[in-house]
Structures are given as structure tokens and as C-alpha cells.
Amino acid sequence: MTGLPARLNAANDTFSARLGYTFARPALLAQALTHRSHGAQHNERFEFIGDAVLNCVVAAALCERFPQMQEGELSRARAGLVNRDMLARLAQRIDIGAHLLLGEGELKSGGATRPSILADAMEAVFGAVFLDRGFDSARDVIVGVYGDILGEPAGAVLAK
């Protein structure tokens, strides 16, 4: 796949399979996986977009799955599903840390396993998918990455 650094290019097929998505514009994936410590074209703007798309997708999924829930319960459930810890767990599931481009200092200090960096990268990947092919593709990827977590009983979702 072109548009990716060699390190990402070699692992892209595996990462795409885990993500359940192949980028039409692989440079977006490269930027989504680039921490600000690594270069000027980093993932923070993608993270911003991914956060918004993620909140929308999870809110809609909760409303559909739990029509009996009140707004306060829905808000608490959404907060539990989009927080740093949950996003870091999802990032670990698809091994984002192995594909991150980090500056030397961040790499040496264990940045590839730091929950905040993993969570931010997960949001950035969601944002990159949205920029690559739009909302429907981003929704499909988010639902796929979350898997059965979005389908858990209401009590389990609220306990997160």
C-alpha cells in the first residue's frame, strides 16, 4: 500500500484486518498513527474528529439498543463506552501500539503502551476513517471494533 512509511506499510494488511477496514487513502492512516512527538503531521486533528464521530455513533447505538433508557442513563452509558480506559482497551485489542509512530523520547518512555496515547490514537483512527470514506464507514468500523461491547445488557453497559 502506498502513502505509508515502510514500517506501517509492512504491517498494514494485519492492521487493516484487525480494524476491519482498508483505507482508500493510506496517508490518512499514517497520520492517524503519528503522535505529535514524531512529526508536524500528527494525529491530533483526526483525534478531534474521531471523538465527535465516536460520540455520535455510540449515542445512536445506545438509543437503538436500549429504547427504555432515560437520557441520564444513556449519557452515563455513553461516557463509560467512550472514556480513555475503554478506548485504550479497544486500541490494545487491535494492537495500535505496535503501529504508532512516536518520537524517540516518547518511544523510550513507553508511549506505545500508555493508555492516553492509545486512546487518542484510537479516536484518530476513527477520525481518519471518517475523512477517508465518510460517516457510514466510520460507523461500521466503530461498531466492528466495539464488537459485542455495544450489545451488552444495559446493566453491564452502565457498570463500565
Tell me the role of every PLM-derived stretch:
Residues 1-160:
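Double-stranded RNA-binding/processing signature
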